[in-house]
Amino acid sequence: MNNPAQFADQPFNKRIEGMGDLAEGVFEGWCGVNYVRYGLNRPPLAMWKLPLRIRHTPDYLTSDYLVEVQGFGRKQIVQMKLDKWKSLLWWDRNVMPVRLFLHDSHNDRQLMFPIKKLRPLIDNAEVRKFPEGNEYYALSAGEVWSLLG
């Protein structure tokens, strides 16, 4: 039997194929307020050419806040890219409050909270790299749920 590579170990062109679809679908069913799609969803653009703040526009807009959706699974690691973290904090400070919606597909649980509440874990997180070299904070799902759940 052929074991597919873990998500973080797959090349970017494979990761992007379904990136966020499951978690975003769960958010849309879970969210109890009106929302509209706001951020870029795999556009046919050279994303690397776009400014980071545009590239990392939060996924959804509500009347009171923006929402960034992120999923994770079996490894129980929330992988927050360093540049995405900085961009989301900019949106939170300068445009509108940002909430992070996390979907744990392995344990079928969800959590939404103001993005800045993640800072204590970010400040102590291990930095790892995706195969193409992009760095991310590796956050233990258990620690996130203990702190914010």
Where are these predicted regions, by residue range?
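Active-site-adjacent loop/helix micro-motif of nuclease/hydrolase catalytic cores
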Residues: G73-W85
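A structural signal for short, well-ordered beta-strand segments and their strand-loop junctions
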Residues: G39, L66-E68, R99-H103
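Acidic-basic catalytic patches of nuclease active cores, encompassing PD-(D/E)XK
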Residues: M1-K49
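Short glycine/proline-enriched coil/turn segments at helix->beta-strand junctions
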Residues: G32-V33, T62-Y65, D92-P97
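Charged, often glycine-rich, active-site loop that binds/positions anionic groups
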Residues: L45-D59
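Nucleic-acid nuclease catalytic cores
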Residues: L89-L118
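Intrinsically disordered, low-complexity terminal regions enriched in charged/polar residues
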Residues: L111-G149
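Conserved catalytic cores of phosphodiester-cleaving nucleases, focusing on short active-site segments
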Residues: P58-R74
